[in-house]
């Protein structure tokens, strides 16, 4: 059996040495270890958007964020919160830039703010290191998204009005809104990044984007036209599902497969442009084939005879 630490100490100086040892032990505990809470200190400030929202104040009391009889929540209270779960899902907040005071928060979970249909603006706190896919799904009024500039894992560079993951190598847009702009440096769009963004009418992709995640633009009901960027090989499941205003889809030569439900519920779709010599595979991507397909000169018969593309209303050769 290993000798306990306290029995290995030789108190050669008697009581004096014991006293010195005790003081050293106390000093070590006062300094603390490197694992101590590293959340930044915040100045006391009332979070007005919560103070005037009694349903959320009730939740704050129930969660123990504030005392049971408290009538306000401050930035100091918010700094002690380390988990929000889906408490704000479906909330009636209009703006929540004071969310930045939740500096103890490390993770924003799936659907954390989903279905908050009045939310127009939010700022992500500095200490968040993990934002789940779909955290802001179905927030149709959202028009301003920013990240605290002290955050080392996410940012909103170039005033993009979105959340960009910066720590996984290639830049990935995790969440966007109707005013999001995509810089040429973004290589990925995360699953559900724009899901339910009903105010989005157009989107311009970087030319060399590599991947658009599943359900990324699901239920973007005002989106009218899409040009899939060069570099994307698969149109993932449900990517544009429920885009009821989508009229024209332009594919590129890099597209190999249209996955299940990719364009399901696109009731206005009337035109697909496909420049590939060999028709891409279609895996139940459409629920209607009342669409005219435009292909390069000399390929009409190839598409008409293809087991996937022969079901479309018409195939025409581009001039």
PLM-predicted stretches and their roles:
Residues 51-65:
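Short, non-transmembrane alpha-helical segments in secretory-pathway proteins
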């Amino acid at each position: 059996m290993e000798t306990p630490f306290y029995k290995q100490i030789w108190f050669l100086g008697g009581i004096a040495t014991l006293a010195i040892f005790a003081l050293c032990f106390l000093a070590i505990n006062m300094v603390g270890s490197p694992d101590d809470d590293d959340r930044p200190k915040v100045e006391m400030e009332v979070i007005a958007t919560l103070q005037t929202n009694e349903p959320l104040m009730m939740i704050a009391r129930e969660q123990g964020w504030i005392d049971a009889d408290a009538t306000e929540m401050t930035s100091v209270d918010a700094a002690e919160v380390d988990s929000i779960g889906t408490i704000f899902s479906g909330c009636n907040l209009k703006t929540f830039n004071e969310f930045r005071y939740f500096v103890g928060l490390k993770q924003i979970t799936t659907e954390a703010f989903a279905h908050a249909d009045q939310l127009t603006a939010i700022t992500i706190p500095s200490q968040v290191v993990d934002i789940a896919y779909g955290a802001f799904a179905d927030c149709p009024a959202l028009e301003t998204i920013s990240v605290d500039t002290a955050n080392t894992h996410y940012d909103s560079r170039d005033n993009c009005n979105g959340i960009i993951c910066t720590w996984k190598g290639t830049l990935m847009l995790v969440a966007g809104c109707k005013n999001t702009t995509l810089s040429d440096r973004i290589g990925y769009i995360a699953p559900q990044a724009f899901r339910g963004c009903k105010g989005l009418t157009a989107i311009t992709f970087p030319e060399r984007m590599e991947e658009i995640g599943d359900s990324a633009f699901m239920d973007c009901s005002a989106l009218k036209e899409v040009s899939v960027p060069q570099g994307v090989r698969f149109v993932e499941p449900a990517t544009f599902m429920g885009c009821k205003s989508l009229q024209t889809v332009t594919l590129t030569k890099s597209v190999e497969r249209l996955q299940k439900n990719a364009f399901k519920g696109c009731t206005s779709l009337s035109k697909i442009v496909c420049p590939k010599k060999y028709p891409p595979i279609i895996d139940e991507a459409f629920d209607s084939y009342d669409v005219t397909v435009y292909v390069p000169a000399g390929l009409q018969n190839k598409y008409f005879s293809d087991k996937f593309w022969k079901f479309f209303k018409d195939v025409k050769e581009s001039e």
